Curated annotation (Swiss-Prot):
GO terms for molecular function: RNA binding; tRNA pseudouridine(55) synthase activity. The active site is at D48 (nucleophile). Responsible for synthesis of pseudouridine from uracil-55 in the psi GC loop of transfer RNAs. It is an enzyme of class 5 (isomerase). The gene is truB. This is tRNA pseudouridine synthase B. Belongs to the pseudouridine synthase TruB family. Type 1 subfamily.
């Protein structure tokens, strides 16, 4: 007879984790979920095991709004090893080609310029995108290459930091769906020498403050401190969380009076003054502006519910 599944606590918010190198995004997600004893958790766009940096982890009801972070732009610092191409486009892969590094400063500047702005990118075979129901990296591990369509991305900023020997350091501000490994691999081919990522750090996601990032070690230390002091771990851990609606912070706010919000929370569109003409909105209620979900302005100018916060009993 199987034991009943243990239910975690109803904690809602977003933790800005500084992901360590060498761990998968799912591994750190599970560790954070256990530390917080959360009933639900999800991340908002995986980082490769080699990569470090900002990984927003949504807990509880915040998982409903994680999609808005998946759609947001991001900034990275990357160091490439020139002269070597790998099968994964990073240092975790096998070297498949070595060539001399002979380009000039002018050739580098010209090559970098081709990656700025709106461009098309063919994703790496070593990615989590799916083809006929299977992830691309599953095919790649079997030595199978499948067709991939080029996808539109935007590189808002591509900053040259340094070029020393066979290392090239860049900073990239880009749209959703951008693979930094692929940019480096494509750049290496354009320069005629090959390249792969040896260091990758995600600096920012959307408008989240960098100073609110915390490490796994810090979380574990706080949990241990709470146990030593005989206080609930939540007392030390929960203040680290960003609000559950922070993934949707770019959307305008519509505040409903309590007389209208009850209908909205029951799934009905409502009319209210001050709403935009169209698009998605963050919906709050009452004088304290409590977040109750995401809405969308319908054809009649009403605020129609799209994703609602489920209120759990205390």
């Amino acid at each position: 007879m199987s034991r009943p599944r243990r239910r975690g606590r109803d904690i809602h918010g977003v933790l800005l984790l500084d992901k360590p190198q060498g761990m998968s995004s799912n591994d750190v997600l599970q560790k954070v979920k256990r530390i917080y004893n959360a009933n639900r958790a999800g991340h908002t766009g995986a980082l490769d095991p080699l990569a470090t940096g900002m990984l927003p982890i949504c807990l509880g009801e915040a998982t409903k709004f994680s999609q808005y972070l998946l759609d947001s732009d991001k900034r990275y610092r990357v160091i490439a090893r020139l002269g070597q191409r790998t099968d994964t486009s990073d240092a975790d892969g096998q070297i498949v080609q070595e060539r001399p590094v002979t380009f000039s400063a002018g050739q580098l500047a010209s090559a970098l310029e081709t990656f700025r702005g709106d461009i098309e990118q063919i994703p790496s075979m070593y990615s989590a995108l799916k083809y006929q129901g299977k992830k691309l990296y599953e095919y790649a591990r079997l030595g199978i290459e499948v067709p991939r369509e080029a996808r539109p991305i935007t590189v808002y900023e591509l900053l040259f930091i340094r070029h020393e020997g066979n290392e090239l350091e860049l900073e990239v501000h880009c749209s959703k769906g951008t693979y930094i490994r692929t940019i480096i691999d494509d750049l290496g081919e354009k320069l005629g020498c090959g390249a792969h990522v040896i260091y990758l750090r995600r600096l920012t996601v959307s408008k989240y403050p960098v100073e609110r990032m915390v490490t796994l070690e810090h979380l574990q230390a706080l949990a241990a401190q709470a146990e030593q002091q005989g206080v609930p771990a939540a007392q030390l851990l929960d203040p680290l969380l960003m609000p559950m609606d922070s993934p949707a912070s770019d959307y305008p706010v519509v505040n409903l009076p309590l007389t209208s919000s009850v209908y909205f929370k029951n799934g009905n569109p409502v009319r209210t003054s001050g709403a935009p003409l169209n698009g998605l909105v963050r919906v709050t209620e009452g004088e304290d502006g409590k977040f109750i979900g995401m809405g969308e302005i319908d054809d009649e100018g009403r605020v129609a519910p799209r994703r609602l916060v489920v209120e759990h009993p205390a």
